[in-house]
Amino acid sequence: MARFLVALLATTLVAVQAGGQLGHAAPATAEVFWRAVLPHSPLPDAVLRLLKQPAAGVELLTEATSFVRDAEDRPPFDYRDYSRSPPDDEPSKSTGAASGARDFDYDDYSGGDKLRGAASGARDFDYDDYSGADKLRGATDEYKAPSSSLAGNGASMARGGKAETTTVFFHEEAVRVGKRLPFRFPPATPAALGFLPRQVADSVPFTTAALPGVLATFGVASDSATVASMEATLRACESPTIAGESKFCATSLEALVERAMEVLGTRDIRPVTSTLPRAGAPLQTYTVRSVRPVEGGPVFVACHDEAYPYTVYRCHTTGPSRAYMVDMEGARGGDAVTIATVCHTDTSLWNPEHVSFKLLGTKPGGTPVCHLMPYGHIIWAKNVNRSPA
């Protein structure tokens, strides 16, 4: 895998040098593109950090080759898919619940409790597949709605053994000033190489069928843990959608923005992201201090970063939804965060076994199902204040 990353890094360096972008003073080409097409939308911090200047080649190479080690060190969770677990998944592998180390993905509503490998950090759930069941990665029975007083706020927490962990899904009634929710925010785990220049990203085949050839070209063993993560991401990008849903995967910042514009039917869009500490924050109870609706609905495009050596976003339309920016204050004092929140108002086409229904005690077509957008994930909304589209 290291050879693949070294070769990819070398290609990136050549491309950037050819474009005259080498050096910390010059903005990345993708950053120039963003400013040109989204002049009224500052680059979110998480996205800006992914636009790495390859001038620091040695440092970047160290980060890139560490992708293999990081993938192997991560817990056996992938919170981007709710598909069924293979028969050999073991509940005992679902570690980390007691310490609040579980995180969740909100982009797979079609799967069950499939363990897909440590594709993207300490994550259990996927947020863009609505047709599947309770992909709790072998730990389904350990998760249940809380019996604490917080349940009255419409929250549903993951519980492992006797220890409560972070909120996973919650009812829309919890998005009110004064409500309390327990959250643990994990450290950011961005792709090692960040966003590739578009010409480089477009030159690397991004399909399951092409992956063996790509790996062979760079002499990468096909049985490595990192390759398994890459395969899982490709499968997720190629998986079918539910009726009425649009989905795409973007391997460059330019493709991400252009495809979001295409799906929303207007070039006047804006990104909405959570403001969270990049280093993460420990489990604690947060109190909602203010709630601001996100205009531009009822359909948004939600984008979630995927496990790959370079940045890949998997995006999908949310279906009928309401979105909010929720300001919260942590019980420990000083820990203020703002979470971008999506509440799906029509779940009638979701799989009845979807984990959110189990945690919230509801069913398809019932009350809205809400979840936050983790660090680096993006909601794209029509900019209704500037465009009638």
Swiss-Prot record:
Residue ranges of region Disordered? 73-105
Gene Ontology CC: one annotated term: Ubisch body
One GO biological process term? pollen development
Q: Which InterPro entries match?
A: BURP, BURP_dom
What Pfam families does UniProt report for this protein, alphabetically?
BURP
**Which keywords describe this protein according to UniProt?**
Signal
- What SMART domains is this protein classified in? BURP
Q: Provide the function of this protein.
A: Required for pollen development. Probably synthesized in the tapetum, packaged in Ubisch bodies and transported at appropriate stages to the micropsores.
> What is this protein identified as?
Protein RAFTIN 1A
Q: Which organism is it from?
A: Triticum aestivum (Wheat)
